[in-house]
Amino acid sequence: MSSVKRSPKQEIVTQFHCSAAEGDIAKLTGILSHSPSLLNETSENGWTALMYAARNGHPEIVQFLLEKGCDRSIVNKSRQTALDIAVFWGYKHIANLLATAKGGKKPWFLTNEVEECENYFSKTLLDRKSEKRNNADWLLAKESHPATVFILFSDLNPLVTLGGNKESFQQPEVRLCQLNYKDIKDYLAQPEEITLIFLGVELEMKDKLLNYAGEVPREEEDGLVAWFALGIDPIAAEEFKQRHENCYFLHPPMPALLQLKEKEAGVVAQARSVLAWHSRYKFCPTCGNGTKIEEGGYKRVCLKEDCPSLNGVHNTSYPRVDPVVIMQVIHPDGTRCLLGRQKRFPPGMFTCLAGFIEPGETIEDAVRREVEEESGVKVGHVQYVSCQPWPMPSSLMIGCLAVAVSTEIKVDKNEIEDARWFTREQVLDVLTKGKQQAFFVPPSRAIAHQLIKHWIRINPNL
């Protein structure tokens, strides 16, 4: 049988792949210097030079190709990446090189354009006006201003009421109870029993200020409607509810907080996170003595005169935010995604993997570490998408897309209960039909849902 005649390009691709398979670094370098476009060229079976080097145990070739920026996420016709091949043939050193390499070419199915979006808990009614936090006289005047808005909390649960048309078949809208000075002045008279936080001023000037023109001297009116969060103890909260039968404290936090109007949810996220910090830091982390609240609720100051925390700026004196990575892990071929579940989840719910960023760690490295720890899957390229404040009690969810460079799942049962690859079609069915399917994902107001939808929207014709 006569052999099929190859084109000049096919011939040079074959030579390039053979040099990788044979470990001939000199020949490989020479070919690539004349034809750099060959770096990610595939053979008829979908293999790249990187795959041939991984299959035949040539770490120096693998290292060279990685330094040139080859794409580790390419899959062959057997749905294997170069890392999968190295692991299968037992080349641990090469597998480690492929798993830990950074940079490289962005996978073809990811776009360069990432539209900025506002997730739930991100929108707000307020300008925080941080420059007013040190102005004690201004804050005191605003506390008693008739237009000032107070939102009440007990055990970090906001006081709400049902809005909208109660005769409608739709679920009633949950809204914050916006209280005024007269409603809560008795609590303000007992500062040692409450926690008061200045949240900011309304972004839009309100006509309601005109209603109080006679109550506030004109020279003292600055046109700003201030908002405060007020934390009270459970006994006081119960007494307040008895006097206001149409109000109740919204709990448990999840999923109850997802019922709020979007802009009010942003206010609650701010207030709840700061109140949670105060509930945990009543005593100085440096020396153990008591502390007092300053700067409108955004600082705690130690009462001990010689405490080191009084010298300089210390992060223990200010509200903390815990950064968390949450990632939509994409299969190397771009057609599937990795979702997992914890034991505490409702039956059938799967979501994006997530975990806290550790000290001295980048977002990208945290994504790679968490995915591998929980699922055993190795990740290469990481791309930021959007973020979401998450007041449980004070996290910032940093949403990313992460492209896998291996496909075998090995779940750590101490981390999660299960993890699986789901096809684009399966995920689309879940997004359009909801819980009618065999599994479901978090609601639309969770960033995990938005990351999943973001993946579906890119390259929809795959």
From Swiss-Prot:
Gene Ontology cellular component terms for the protein in this record: cytosol; peroxisome
InterPro entries referenced in this protein's UniProt entry, alphabetically: Ankyrin_rpt, Ankyrin_rpt-contain_sf, NAD-cap_RNA_hydrolase_NudC, NADH_PPase-like_N, NudC-like_C, NUDIX_hydrolase-like_dom_sf, NUDIX_hydrolase_CS, NUDIX_hydrolase_dom
Reaction catalyzed: a 5'-end NAD(+)-phospho-ribonucleoside in mRNA + H2O = a 5'-end phospho-adenosine-phospho-ribonucleoside in mRNA + beta-nicotinamide D-ribonucleotide + 2 H(+); NAD(+) + H2O = beta-nicotinamide D-ribonucleotide + AMP + 2 H(+); NADH + H2O = reduced beta-nicotinamide D-ribonucleotide + AMP + 2 H(+); NADPH + H2O = reduced beta-nicotinamide D-ribonucleotide + adenosine 2',5'-bisphosphate + 2 H(+)
Record-linked SUPFAM superfamilies: Ankyrin repeat, Nudix
UniProt binding sites for Mg(2+) 1: A354, E374, E415
Keyword Flavoprotein appears in the UniProt entry: no
Residue interval(s) of motif Nudix box: 355-376
EC number: 3.6.1.-, 3.6.1.22
Name this protein carries in UniProt: NAD-capped RNA hydrolase NUDT12
Originating organism: Macaca fascicularis
Lineage start: Eukaryota, Metazoa, Chordata, Craniata, Vertebrata
